From Swiss-Prot:
The modification N-acetylthreonine is found at residue 2. This is RWD domain-containing protein 1. Pfam families: DFRP_C, RWD. Protects DRG2 from proteolytic degradation.
Length: 243
């Protein structure tokens, strides 16, 4: 007759020595415990993790143990579902033998596989973004292929813009023509400027101030005086002189 209690106690002792940092006893009757399983580090030291809870049934290992995912980190819902299916399959295959180590090892491998899938998915997303950016750059460089439809659309827009430019230019030329002075207007403008200058001088009268410093060196200038020149001839050469 199988002593299920002894087999369970022996396995618990083995599990505690194998997983000293992740094994936790929850209760002794019925025997219940958790084991935390962590994947190997992936890209950027990212990991996925789950804590498995096991409870021995009365006739374990001839009956499968009760199991559940007690907690998890960085796992999607479909990952959790896959792990539970894996546990069910492994439990059936190992029925009649102590199996907790086998179940935990299978989950460990599954977590490593999930990390690899995450890495692959991110690499594919990165490549897809690079491809989209490259295609956008090519489209920008080569431009949009010309079709009858987009050419007619462009032509209509171009003609409308050209018409607006012509209207603006005509308006500016018309305005410039209105502001252009005739010959008579230019003459009257010049005459008015002369009159205003004369009026300014008359209004200033004796109030006009002269800066004498401008003339302070005039005495030092050697002005040529014809009478002081012994060779001076008041009659210009070539002119007719009469007594």
């Amino acid at each position: 007759m199988t002593d299920y209690g002894e087999e369970q106690r022996n396995e618990l002792e083995a599990l505690e020595s194998i997983y000293p940092d992740s094994f936790t006893v929850l209760s002794e009757s019925p025997p219940s415990f958790t084991i935390t399983v962590t994947s190997e580090a992936g890209e950027n030291d990212e990991t996925v993790q789950t804590t498995l809870k096991f409870t021995y049934s009365e006739k374990y290992p001839d009956e499968t143990p009760l199991y559940e995912i007690f907690s998890q980190e960085n796992l999607e819902d479909n990952d959790v579902s896959d792990i539970l299916k894996l546990l069910a399959l492994q439990a059936e295959e190992n029925l009649g033998m102590v199996m907790i180590f086998t179940l935990v090892t299978a989950v460990q491998e599954k977590l490593n596989e999930i990390v690899d899938q995450i890495k692959t998915r991110r690499e594919e997303e990165k490549k897809q973004k690079e491809k989209e950016a490259e295609e956008a750059e090519k489209k920008l460089f080569h431009g949009t292929p010309v079709t009858i439809e987009n050419f007619l659309s462009w032509k209509a827009k171009f003609d409308a813009e050209l018409l607006e430019i012509k209207k603006k230019r005509m308006k500016e030329e018309e305005q410039a023509g209105k502001n252009k002075l005739s010959g008579k207007q230019l003459f009257e403008t010049d005459h008015n400027l002369d009159t205003s200058d004369i009026q300014f001088l008359e209004d200033a009268g004796n109030n006009v101030e002269v800066d004498e410093s401008l003339f302070q060196e005039m005495d030092d200038l050697e002005l040529e005086d014809g009478e002081d020149d012994p060779d001076y001839n008041p009659v210009a050469p070539g002119s007719d002189s009469s007594d």
